[in-house]
From Swiss-Prot:
Family matches, as PROSITE patterns: FAD_PCMH (PS51387)
Record keywords: Cell cycle, Cell division, Cell shape, Cell wall biogenesis/degradation, Cytoplasm, FAD, Flavoprotein, NADP, Oxidoreductase, Peptidoglycan synthesis
GO cellular component entries: cytosol
Protein name as annotated: UDP-N-acetylenolpyruvoylglucosamine reductase
Catalytic activity: UDP-N-acetyl-alpha-D-muramate + NADP(+) = UDP-N-acetyl-3-O-(1-carboxyvinyl)-alpha-D-glucosamine + NADPH + H(+)
Name of the gene this protein is made from: murB
Pfam families, alphabetized: FAD_binding_4, MurB_C
Length: 295
């Protein structure tokens, strides 16, 4: 019998996750949990005596939920984890804050260095987890430290060096939920910051399928190479499996054309990886997370 910890937040059983993802595909979460606050989250983790499997869920922008859904508990941090505040010449930002919202906040407060976030879908927590980056900047360039909680309910702090940022990854221990990030502040000019943000937005809209059901870059760039060039070289721009296709506009982006399943998307990605490897010997690494069970 499934026994759930007593919490102040909200549980939903057999909860459909499809509508929360940018791809609009996937199955249900066995249990969906939105904690009220950090103490509620801690209480849940401490009480999880059955060791129910745990997955965290952000903005749903860089993820494929498999069609068989997710066993155990999916935790989504809500608005109470999205605050932005100034403390001792640093920005303290909740992990569920959207990258775009932080970029706009920094522009309004003449803080430079965050312009690139306007072009990165998702949350601060997800950005830290994958060292998200674009247009010459990455999270590693602006982070001072993070606060997290492990699955045993212990609050932990990691400095930039301890996080061990790498290209689209880090060396953090597994089974962590990122709660806050501390950023350094560099003052700038609001108008110049806005100009740079507009440049980034214009570049995105002209080169990426941002109005489609997509999940951002599908594959990380191999060292010294561009994934899209390798994909284009094997003629897979626009290639389709089921309801999923590689974008005609940017062939490192997968698109749900309206009737794709998670299997269509994952099969398409694996097919692209196979063809690129056969042609160039390069193993493309997924940048999009795939979680859950196959049907």
């Amino acid at each position: 019998m499934l026994i759930l910890p007593i919490v102040k937040g909200e549980y939903k059983k057999d909860y459909n996750l499809k509508h929360l993802t940018w791809f609009k595909v996937g199955g249900n979460a066995e249990i969906f949990f939105k904690p009220l606050d950090r103490e509620d989250l801690k209480s849940f983790l401490i009480q999880n005596k059955q060791k129910l499997p745990i997955k965290t869920f952000g903005a749903g922008s860089n993820i494929i939920i498999r069609d068989g859904g997710i066993e155990g508990v999916v935790i989504k941090l809500g608005q109470n984890f999205s605050n932005i505040e100034f403390i001792d010449n640093h920005l303290i930002v909740g992990s569920s804050c959207l990258n775009y919202n932080l970029a706009k906040f920094c522009q309004a407060n003449a803080i430079s260095g965050f312009e690139f976030l306007v072009g990165i879908p998702g949350t601060i927590g997800g950005g830290v987890a994958m060292n998200a980056g674009a247009y010459g900047s990455e999270f590693k360039d602006i982070i001072v430290q993070i606060e997290a909680i492990d699955f045993a309910g212990n609050f932990l702090t990691f400095t930039n060096e301890e996080i061990g940022f790498k290209y689209r990854s880090n060396n953090l221990p597994k089974n962590l939920i990122i709660l806050k990030a501390v950023f350094k502040i560099n003052k700038g000019d609001s108008e110049n910051i806005l100009l740079r943000m507009n440049e980034i937005n214009n570049a995105r809209s002209s080169t990426q399928p941002i109005k489609e059901r997509t999940g951002g870059s599908t594959f990380a760039n191999p060292a010294g190479r561009k994934s899209w060039e390798l994909i284009d070289k094997v003629g897979l721009r626009g290639y389709r499996i089921g309801g999923a296709s590689m974008s005609e506009l940017h062939c490192n982006f997968m698109i749900n054309n309206g009737d794709a399943t998670a299997k269509d998307l994952e099969d398409l990605g694996d097919f692209v990886r196979q063809k690129v490897f056969e042609d160039s010997g390069v193993k493309l690494e997924w940048e999009i997370k795939r979680i859950g069970r196959h049907p």
